[in-house]
């Protein structure tokens, strides 16, 4: 995962090309228009990302995740059975942000404490529902 310090403050682009957003990279790719596409002509082979004028997407979505042990990836795979779409591989992905923060709170058993602090009520037991997926029932939550 690239951090803010790994990226150029501004990327150069023309009507036909966009440069790779990673500092020190001189690769340029064809400029995407309209819809984001994962095609070779938009790919930086040095950094394994697909580039558009406004975002980039990792070729491997795991590269955008902080929590990617086998149990984490198994859970993510199960979640995708009920989740309609995923943009978790995009650099500015709300899905990746949600996963990285809430998975941390869940793994470190801090979710109940955070909820108790936010609501000023005790929350001894919590169940985190990721995108309508219940880990308890292993299906869409209802």
Question: Where would I find each of the regions flagged by the language model?
Answer:
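Charged, terminal alpha-helix-loop-beta segments
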Residues: 1-142
């Amino acid at each position: 995962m690239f951090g803010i310090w790994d990226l150029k403050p501004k990327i150069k682009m023309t009507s036909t090309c966009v440069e790779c957003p990673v500092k020190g990279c001189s690769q340029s790719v064809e400029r995407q228009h309209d819809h984001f596409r994962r095609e070779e002509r938009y790919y930086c082979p040095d950094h394994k990302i697909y580039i558009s004028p406004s975002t980039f997407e990792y070729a491997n979505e795991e590269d955008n995740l902080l929590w990617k042990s086998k149990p984490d990836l198994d859970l993510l795979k199960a979640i995708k059975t009920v989740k309609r779409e995923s943009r978790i591989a995009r650099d500015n992905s709300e899905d990746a942000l949600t996963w990285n923060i809430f998975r941390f709170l869940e793994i470190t058993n801090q979710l109940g404490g955070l909820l108790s602090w936010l609501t000023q009520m005790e929350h001894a037991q919590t169940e985190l529902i990721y995108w309508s997926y219940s880990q308890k029932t292993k299906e869409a939550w209802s």
